[in-house]
Amino acid sequence: MIKVNSSQFNHIYNNRIHFPYSIALLAGYVKTQKNIHKHFRFEKTFVFRDNLDSNIEQCKDTDILLCSCYVWNWQITTRFAKEVKKINPECTIIFGGPQIPNHIEDFFKEYPFVDIAVHGEGEFIISNIFEAYLKDRNYTNVNGISTKDFTTPPQKRIENFENLPSPYLTNMVWDLVDRVDGISWIASWETNRGCPYLCTFCDWGSATATKMRKWTDERLFKEIEWFADNKIPYIDCCDANFGIYQARDKQLAVKLKEEKLKKGYPQTFRTNWA
């Protein structure tokens, strides 16, 4: 069994911390690929910043390390991965997330401990990397990645979300974390992906001026119920423009309020606007 560790370090806000949503998306999709999944074992994701030495030690025999990279965790993630490579040089370290640059000429000179950098949506790419890892570890046919030796063509954006399982409805987010007394969890939530705009001072993300794709109403309503049933206090909506689908997004807002009034959760909903 191939051991997979992962990190998505976050900050604690008022005794709350984000679920490792991005890692859960990847693990959930890999789990649907039966011929691949049976060979890989996902360990708990590292999210807390105060256990770094222990986290490094836990990776001394890991085969693959997935690191979800954002501006707020870049320094600790690179430090962590560098130390893992020192004690476990055979570990394949894969970086992905919004912090990975598209122009990567000097990236591997500065971060030589990284083996593969993933560009864009990671679900299909990670699955393809795992498939190549099982076969011959030749990644030249995996789209959407860079190594120190090559960059492959971009991976096409995912058009059909039906095959992407919910990290909440499958409880994947719970599978990847240790519950800690006194700590509650923040749920990152996507109702769609993409953004039709190209604002000069955008601080949302890199998928601007792209076709928008959305999840089904049924799934989103069930996820809202899951948030309430699991007493999730804070929803961090990752959409670029919540409300752009006016009729549907109003229904989601009404559903959020209904669950709050009935069950007491979620308590806060944060989103982005154009």
Each model region followed by its residue ranges:
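Conserved beta-strand positions
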Residues: 6, 67, 95, 119, ...
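Glycine- and acidic-residue-enriched helix-capping/strand-helix junction motifs
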Residues: 11-23
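Glycine-rich beta-alpha loop elements in corrinoid/cobalamin-binding modules
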Residues: 29, 38-158
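N-terminal [4Fe-4S]-dependent radical SAM core
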Residues: 5, 142, 147-188
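Radical SAM [4Fe-4S] cluster-binding motif and immediate context
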Residues: 167-274
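A structural signal for short coil/turn segments at secondary-structure junctions
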Residues: 34, 88, 111, 230-231, ...
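Hydrophobic/aromatic residues located in beta-strands of well-ordered beta-sheets
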Residues: 4, 42, 93, 142, ...
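Short amphipathic alpha-helix
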Residues: 21-28, 223
